[in-house]
Structure formats: structure tokens, C-alpha cells
Amino acid sequence: MSDVSVLAHQLDRQRRRRLLLTAVLSCAVIAGIALDTHVVRTDAAGQTQQGFSPDSWAEQHFPEVKQSVERRAVAAQTLAAALQANQQAAAAQYGVGSPLPVIPVRLEGVVQPGEKGIFPLQVAGVPESLKVRLQTGPALSGTDLRDASGTIQFGDFTNQIEYQNAGAALNRAMKKSVLEKLDRNALPGKTVEVIGVFRLLNASNWLITPVSVEVK
């Protein structure tokens, strides 16, 4: 065999070794990626199989929120008078958060005919100009429950989406605990005892999200 043939044979063997080594390294990289890949599934409620579960979180925290609201709730008559006398001072005394505080309230009232699960309440001892409404679902608006205690902060969550989902999940947890047993069609004309919260958007218009409803 000539020197040229020997050299060509050696170069060919080196190329084959390099190709084999490249193939082995590529397989190792692909295997590593596969091992490090996690499949995340979502269900209809938007919960993740891994990571933050809004509804699980809410089931755990709603009892704490409820207890905080019930402990701090002020009678509607006292609150209405305080807001009428000095709204800023009343908000600072009874509310949580700013510039639109969430205020806990307790009241007894007669349910008036409503629409879409929102019922006006006739409450004795408050100004006639005060509009009090109770939202009972099935659709519940707002993040008043999330913000009611002052202990649930944005920094507790990874991002804004989790923070928003936590608020919606608290509404669902309350609905399951408090509202599922209500016969909405039978509410008008009934007297109810309510403990709940509302965001102070307008001192003369309270939309209450309940943590407790007792029909008498």
C-alpha cells in the first residue's frame, strides 16, 4: 500500500470517529433535554397540575378571611353615620387599603326583588339615600374578599395573573361555603342577616360580598 493510500485510510478513520463522537454527544444532549422537560397540563378552571393552584389556595385561606371580616365587621347604622360625618376618617378607622378601602359590615335587612343575583336590601336605621345591595352569584365581581383582611399581598404571588386568580378563587370558595345553599328565587321578601365587605367607591352605594348570610 502506498504512503498516499495509508494516509487516506487514516484520514477516513478519523472522520468516522469524529462523526461517531458527534452522534453520541447529540444523543446525550437530547436525552438530557428530555429528562429536564416537564409537561404542565391545565384543566377547565385554569389550574395547573404543577405550581400554583388558585382553588386549593382559596380553600385554605377563605376561613381566615371570613374570620377576619366577622371579627371586624361594624354595624351598618354605625358605619353609615360615620361615613356621613367624615368619610375619610371612617374609611381610615374601619377600612383596609387605599385609596379605595374595603370595609367589613354587618346588617339585617329585607331582601327586595333583584336582577342577576344582585338584591337590594332594605335596612332600618340607615339614610334613605343609602343604596345597599347584596351579590349572591352565580357571577361574583370584584376582589373585595382578597383585599378585605390586609394580609394577602401582591408580593405573596409570582405575578399579577396569580394575584388576580387568587381573588377569583376566593369568590368561588365563598360561593361554595356560603351561597350554594341559598334559594335565590325565594329571597325577595325574606329578612337576612349578612356579614360581608364592600369597596368604598361611593359612600351612598354599597355592593356587599358576603362571608355569612342567614335567612330568617
Task: Give short role names for the model-derived ranges.
Residues 2-216:
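OB-fold and OB-like single-stranded nucleic-acid-recognition modules
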